[in-house]
Amino acid sequence: MRANKGSAGLDDQSVTDFEANLGRNLYMLWNRMSSGSYFPPPVMRVEIQKKDGGTRPLGVPTVADRVAQTVVKMIVEPVVEPVFHENSYGYRPNRSAHHALTMARKRCWHRDWVIDLEIKGFFDNLDHQLVMRAVEHHIRAHWVLLYIKRWLEAPVMDGDKIVEKEEGKGSPHDCMDAGGRAMQEQLPRVE
């Protein structure tokens, strides 16, 4: 978290503030997670500038919630990483936008066209039941499933009000690239 310079969530607690009482904060988080009583606090919605001049919503969790998410990520990632498509670069270990650019550069010698695709509101409209079924296909630990479901359902604060979302639909969380796999299934010969 420190490396990617994450900002404070709704509670205004920075990484430095969290570290000031690290033992206490980690114990409280562990105690709540291990007892099943941890509920993610609301995610703070911020608008991020896009290069085309528009904006996109991004959900900023609290530092403590990011620590909790990291715990679950450490369990989930080794299980699902081998399943992800080789052309998926977003939010993956040892892969970055630079790797994607390198691959795009290599491929431009074989193709003279490119698809630039953005599905507006993709993560805002994901069906949570479908997401959970996909996760349950790979993950069996009930406590992990419990917290993933709670994160999917976490409220989103925009300013001083909770954003109403459709039952079972997404929110502006920073999510892994799901569109690449769908594209590969629909256009399997495109590299």
Please report, for each region that a protein language model flagged, where it lies by residue.
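Conserved polymerase palm-domain catalytic core
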Residues: 32-47, 51, 83-191
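PAPS/PAP-binding and catalytic site of the sulfotransferase fold
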Residues: 71-72, 131
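Charged boundary/loop elements
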Residues: 1-17, 74-90
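Amphipathic alpha-helical blocks
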Residues: 7, 17-40
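Conserved phosphate-binding loops in nucleotide/dinucleotide-binding enzymes
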Residues: 57-58, 62
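A broadly conserved amphipathic alpha-helix scaffold signal in soluble, globular proteins
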Residues: 73, 77, 102-105
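Duplex nucleic acid-engaging cores and interfaces of nucleic-acid transaction enzymes
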Residues: 63-71, 105
